[in-house]
A protein has these predicted regions:
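Acidic, metal-coordinating catalytic segment for phosphate/diphosphate chemistry
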Residues: 10-60
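Short helix-to-loop capping/linker segments positioned immediately adjacent to catalytic or ligand/cofactor-binding
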Residues: 93-95, 111-118, 133-139
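A short coil-to-beta-strand element that immediately follows conserved catalytic motifs
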Residues: 116-128
C-alpha cells in the first residue's frame, strides 16, 4: 500500500512514510511466513508480525518510560515502555533475537536520540516473547509477537518529537501510581506495556543484577487484550 492511499490521508507525513516499511509476518510460534507493509499489518484485522519492546533502567534502577507523540498513527499519546517498534524485513533484522536487537538499536537512535553504539546490540538482554492482539480503534490494530529486551545503563537521550512527546524515569511505586491513574482513565497505557508490567516487570526489577538468569525462548500467548 503506497503512501497517499485513503487509509493514510490526514496523518503526519513522516509517520505515513514509515507505514510503507515491511514488517516480518510470522505464525503464532514465531516462524516467518512472509512480509507486508506496516499499513497492512495494522489495518483492519491486521497480520501477525514481529515487534520488540526495550526496557531501559538507569543505575538507580529506575525505568525509562515514554508518552508517544500525538502524530503516531497507532496508539497516539499513550504511555509505553522505553522504546517499542518492529524489526523490518531487511538488513538481517529478520534473524530472530539478533535481528530484533539490530532493529532495537536502530530505533533507539531514531526515537530516543541515543548516540549510535551508546547501547550496543550485545548490551540488550533478551528476556522472552509474547503474542498478543489489541485494537487501537475501529481502524487500526496491533497483532504481534513481541521480543522483550532489558538494558541497565546511564545514557543521554534526545527524544524525537515526531515519535515521543514526554519521557520520565520511574521506580516501581511511581509506575504503579501511573497505572492506577490509567485505571481511572486519567492517562492511557499501551496494552503491550500493561502486559509486560502484569506478567514480567516485577521479576525483571528484582533480577536486574542477574538478568540473564530469567530469560526463556518461549512465546507467551496472551490472547486479545484492551
Amino acid at each position: 500500500m503506497a503512501v497517499g492511499d485513503s487509509d493514510l490521508q490526514g496523518y503526519d507525513e513522516a509517520q505515513k512514510k514509515m507505514m510503507n516499511e515491511n514488517c516480518i509476518i510470522v505464525d503464532e510460534n514465531d516462524k516467518i511466513t512472509g512480509q507486508d507493509s506496516k499499513v497492512n499489518c495494522h489495518l483492519g484485522n491486521g497480520k501477525l508480525h514481529r515487534a520488540f519492546s526495550v526496557l531501559i533502567f538507569n543505575s538507580n534502577e529506575k525505568l525509562l518510560i515514554q508518552q508517544r507523540a500525538d502524530e503516531k498513527i497507532t496508539f497516539p499519546s499513550i504511555w509505553a515502555n522505553s522504546c517499542c517498534s518492529h524489526p523490518l524485513y531487511q538488513d538481517g533484522e529478520e534473524e530472530g533475537i539478533e535481528g530484533a536487537k539490530k532493529a532495537a538499536s536502530r530505533k533507539l537512535v531514531q526515537e530516543l536520540g541515543i548516540r549510535p553504539n551508546a547501547i550496543r546490540t550485545e548490551d540488550l538482554n533478551f528476556i522472552t516473547k509474547m503474542h498478543y492482539k489489541a485494537r487501537a480503534d475501529e481502524k487500526w490494530i496491533e497483532h504481534e509477537v513481541d521480543y522483550i529486551f532489558v538494558v541497565k545503563i546511564d545514557v543521554e537521550i534526545d527524544p524525537n518529537p515526531n515519535e515521543i512527546q514526554k519521557t520520565q524515569y520511574v521506580d516501581e511505586e511511581e509506575l504503579n501510581d501511573l497505572f492506577d491513574k490509567a485505571n481511572g482513565n486519567d492517562v492511557k497505557i499501551g496494552p503491550w506495556f500493561r502486559l509486560i508490567k502484569d506478567n514480567f516487570l516485577s521479576k525483571i526489577w528484582r533480577n536486574l543484577e542477574s538478568i540473564e538468569s530469567i530469560n526463556d525462548n518461549e512465546v507467551h500467548h496472551m490472547g486479545e487484550v484492551e
